[in-house]
């Protein structure tokens, strides 16, 4: 993998603590291990008052009972990451503009797709609200690999505590012996230390993932910007701050940008709402691939002697090493990756096609905005960075273009309803080979008898109805 899994990279790149800042190597800020005239058993870990404060915070974090990863901490770190660069509340005027843009966009989409509206309510979110609304899905996606990292950390202490002490940095071993009453105390604790290390690992992974989600919140423009259904069903949401950032450097009016991005958001919701299998299949493809990633516990164990306990970023840096996380080279893993990449390309290609058709002559700069989306993806936008970090998947711009071209050609060859009817079952959709060589698929789609599907898509409750965003859209969104 070229990148560590999502949430495991160091926030802000390599400029974090890097070489340890002022920690001073193994001596840390408290001086060398041999310079401890007061006999403070905590040594480089700080003075007693600082350590007492740290212990209180540590106890609060260790009280987490929600699973392997501390997701409460992840949410707090994500919100702090967003707030660090400013995250003002959404003004009522901006909220009204977003709601009106989604309503208009949804109306235009009625003419270019057989899928009815998938939007029950339209909202404008701050970046912190995006974090709150999407974190439940991130929890589902990140748990498989995060739990493996936490288990690997706990497994380092599952053996002989005396051996473990010899592998740890001297300062960390001394501190643990001081707390537990020497090696005998450590041996007595046994599995208790392993459980504690898992809790610590859960805190570190939660903090890392929170920083990654917070960083992503500063880049996205909507709830579906990364290509996954991250937000609540039926809630179309745009981030006014993200929309404004997207428009920087474009000679396009703010209103036109807002409507164009609202069309992309509403188009995603139509697909996710009226293709019952799509949401679960997309998320399952990510989870399946993540489950096939293994953590190299031996490499993590080898890194432990170099970790400086006085540097709080040291364990984070160890976890950010991409070499620790390796995908299994199995047919099942390759198949999961291919399914995910193809399905993401098909979703993006369909959205791009219907948005281009709906914009038509209504938005004079629709072509320029579509090109801006393509450039954003080619240079590594939120979607590309998310999947590169989450599962090591680099979305290929060529496949995205091929998918858009195929959907456009299908529209011309067969019309809107037969094109959309292909979403009735995953086996009807183009494969990766079809995207690369579309002619045979286009001929097959033309000859395929799908008359029983051409009456239009249905929901699980019965025939789909035309329904747009409601007046509930004045709801301020997630708390």
Regions found by a protein language model. Name each.
Residues 326-479:
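Pan-zinc metallopeptidase signature
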Residues 98-241:
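Auxiliary, metal-adjacent structural segments of Zn-dependent hydrolase domains
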Residues 1-159, 414-479:
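N-terminal low-structure segments adjacent to metalloprotease catalytic domains
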Residues 243-263:
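Short pre-active-site segment immediately N-terminal to the catalytic Zn-binding motif
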Residues 257-276, 407:
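Active-site recognition of the HExxH zinc-binding catalytic motif
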